[in-house]
Amino acid sequence: MVEFKFNTYGTDFGTRDMGQKLREKLLPLINGQEKVVLDFTGVNVVSNSFADECIAKLLLEMPLEELKQRTTFRGLNPLAERSVLVALQRRYKVLSAER
């Protein structure tokens, strides 16, 4: 497994701009051969906007089942976990409606 440690880039993630930058760093890892651990240990804040831009927009690159096979989460605090789940649910719903 490959680890992507979000705390390398900060502890508070609130902007779409940062979400896009980190998604661009994540995508080559996720497209690699090993499963990627998305490690949020030490991260205090993950906004809905950041979660959508960084995590949920990965659904534009691959189906949900493939994303689940290629990634796993670690160290999300309850509020950050909720932001990620809400972002994934909303993005999935939008993509499902478009198909």
Which stretches of residues belong to each language-model region?
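Amphipathic alpha-helical interaction surfaces in cytosolic regulatory modules
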Residues: 10-35, 40-89
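N-terminal presequence-like segments and adjacent domain-start helices
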Residues: 1-10
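Helix-rich interaction surfaces within compact, conserved domain-sized segments
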Residues: 92-93
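Extended, charge-rich low-complexity interaction segments
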Residues: 96-99
